[in-house]
Amino acid sequence: MNRGIARVLPLAAILVLAACSGGSINPSLNPQNSSANEQSAVAPPDALTGPASREAPFVGANPVRRLCPTSVDPQLMECLAMVRTDVAPTLSAGADLADPAKTCIFTNAYCPVDLQSAYALPSLSKGAGRLVAIVDAWGYHHAASDLAYYRKAMGLKACGTGTKCLRIVNQNGNPSPLPRESGPSDDWKGEQSLDLDMVSAICPNCKILLVQTDNNYTSSLYAGVKTAGRLGAKYVGASWGGPESGGDNSIFHQRGVVIVAAAGDNGGGGHYGGPQEPCSYTYVVCAGGTRLVPAHNARGWSESVWNDLTFDRCGFGGSSPCGATGSGCSRKIVKPSWQHDTLCHMRSESDVSATASLRNPVAVYNSEEPGGGCPTSCWFGFGGTSASTQIISGVYALAGNAATQAGAQNIWRNHTGHMSDVTVGNNIDPGVGVTCASTIHYICYARIGFDGPTGWGSPKGLGAF
């Protein structure tokens, strides 16, 4: 399978190969060839269609793979990234001549320039010297080299361990020994590649601290979050979650530290019958997911609730490889004083959202991802609320206001004029066994203003952060 830019061949050579093969992996990659069922997806009414949609329609059975299976052990956390297995990022014509910092090199996967445009971010002028931490389980031996390749291909400044821009430590904060890599059933290497690339895409001037924990037990990952704060990170992304098990945890209430966590990829019912921790904690910013598409409007982009459950290729219920953003009304966490939606009397999830759909994925480079045919083709389309989590963490780092934050209160107080409201879509589909765990309509359905799947919407600049 051709997966875009080769690691060892020049870009121009890959373009020649793409041209010889018709420019795509499969004719069905063209949005105009997608099935009528797929075309019926809920999308903003102003969304562009055809090739301009930047869409990568699902092709064949099981088009998506969850990187981490849902565990029956409540002490294990699930990573919340997903990857396309049927199609891959396809190079745009003339990609070898374009400036990747100004024009995306892929036709069907998003680059940093797309995300910066969609969310009106001053990514090239802000963030210098700020430290963003990514806390993930297990090892990833090629983290530094894969990140270096991604950043070079995307026109971003270099960020490596030699320049102290990138620092990789274990859960105790030491550079060695680093954990071993996870087994084949838990692809935390893919999770880490997505996280590193998304932080880089949003805040290329930021420094990055990658904390690799011994395993994906709750105790290990929580220890990693504590270590991230101790080592000076003011912005921490947690792209994983599990069932609510109790009240707040003090590790996630670190003064002057913004912690963002993923709302989940299992829709409004979730695998756990509601919201998940740590996203539902009082002092955590809970990030939901959207489907971001080019649009006929002044912004140039539009968003709906991320819901890939509505397609017949995705299977049924908890076995579905496809996903939708999580949401919920907590059963464990008391409502924060700054949350003022009226029907959920406990903590409402989510607070904010960003792109997560696998139909319009983000481009990620990973030389260790299964099925990529590396070393000659290592680009993949990724999604899930892991992506939105690290995007939002990067936005907070650009804003640089960690000292004034307490959970998501600034978003709830300052959203007017500084967020793009998402008013289309929902995160359920009874036809595939996913129903809303709450009787409160807005917990699973988008509306004007706050709703569970997308919170107050997606960033419109930095004013709410």
Language-model features, listed with the residues they occupy:
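Aromatic sugar-binding interfaces of carbohydrate-active proteins
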Residues: 388, 404-443
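Short acidic, Gly/Pro-enriched loop/turn segments at secondary-structure junctions
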Residues: 218, 293-301
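Bacterial N-terminal signal peptides that target proteins for export
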Residues: 1-9
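Walker A/P-loop NTP-binding active-site region of P-loop NTPases
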Residues: 395
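C-terminal motif of bacterial Sec signal peptides marking the signal peptidase cleavage site
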Residues: 16-19
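Short, surface-exposed polybasic-and-hydrophobic patches located at secondary-structure transitions
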Residues: 298-318
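Substrate-binding/charge-relay-adjacent region of secreted/lumenal peptidase catalytic domains
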Residues: 27-289, 313, 317-383, 389, ...
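Bacterial signal peptide processing site
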Residues: 21-24
